[in-house]
A protein has these predicted regions:
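Bacterial N-terminal signal peptides
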Residues: 1-9
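Signal peptide processing junction and immediate N-terminal pro/mature segment
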Residues: 10-15
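Extracellular, repeat-based ectodomains that mediate carbohydrate processing or recognition
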Residues: 16-200
Length: 200
C-alpha cells in the first residue's frame, strides 16, 4: 500500500481515493516470538487445498532460539491456528528449518536436519491427511555424506517416488530418490545420492 500511495501522491486519483489517514497498511501476523528460517531449504511454507474440499491448510516451519524445530498449521476450514513441536532441543541454527511435502495420500511429510554435522535426515509424517498436529514418530534417513537444507518434491511424471535435494556430497548440490513411505512410514533411498553440480 505504501508503494502505491507514493506512486499516486499528488495525482487526482490519490487525492480523491486515498489519504494518509484513510490508507490501511497490513502489518502481518506474528507466527513466533523467536522463530527463524533460512532460504536454502524449501518449501519452508506450504498451502494445500484438496479437490474434495476436506483440506484447506497452510503450514509454516521455523526453528526457535532454543533449537526447537516447530511449525504453525492454519486450518482455514476450522479457523484454527496450531503450533506444533516437531523436535525439541535440536540445534539452535536457522539453517535447520523444516520443509514440507504433501504425499499422494494427502498426509504431510516434514523433513529436517542438523547443519552439516550428522550424515542423516530426520522426518515425521502426519497420521491424518492434512493435519500436522497428528505427527507420527521421528524417522531417520541415513546418508554417508554431509546433510543440510532438505528440499523434497514429487514429480508429476513419477508419483511413486520422492526426490530429495540437499547440500551434501563434498558440500555440493546432491539428489536422491526415495520410496514413498511404507505401512510403517519407512522410506528407502533407491537411487543415489548423486552430486548434481561441480562448482569451482
Amino acid at each position: 500500500v505504501m508503494a502505491v500511495w507514493a506512486g499516486l501522491a499528488g495525482t487526482a486519483a490519490a487525492q480523491n481515493l486515498l489519504s494518509p489517514a484513510e490508507a490501511t497498511v497490513y502489518e502481518g501476523d506474528k507466527l513466533a516470538d523467536e522463530g527463524a528460517w533460512c532460504w536454502f531449504a524449501d518449501p519452508r511454507a506450504l498451502h494445500y487445498e484438496n479437490a474434495s474440499g476436506t483440506i484447506n491448510s497452510s503450514y509454516v516451519g521455523y526453528i526457535d532460539v532454543h533449537g526447537a524445530v516447530k511449525a504453525v498449521q492454519y486450518d482455514f476450514l476450522k479457523g484454527r491456528r496450531s503450533e506444533v513441536l516437531i523436535r525439541s532441543y535440536f540445534q539452535p541454527d536457522d539453517h535447520n528449518n523444516p520443509t514440507f511435502l504433501v504425499l499422494p495420500d494427502e498426509r504431510v511429510m516434514i523433513f529436517y536436519s542438523r547443519h552439516t554435522d550428522e550424515p542423516c535426515f530426520y522426518y515425521r509424517i502426519s497420521q491424518v491427511p492434512g493435519d500436522i498436529t497428528t505427527l507420527g514418530e521421528e524417522k531417520k534417513i541415513l546418508t554417508k555424506d554431509n546433510t543440510t537444507y532438505p528440499s523434497p518434491f514429487i514429480l508429476s511424471d513419477d508419483p511413486e517416488h520422492i526426490y530429495l535435494c540437499w547440500r551434501g556430497i563434498r558440500w555440493h548440490p546432491t539428489i536422491a530418490r526415495l520410496s514413498l513411505p511404507d505401512e510403517n512410514d519407512e522410506v528407502q533411498i533407491d537411487w543415489g545420492p548423486y552430486q548434481m553440480v561441480q562448482s569451482t
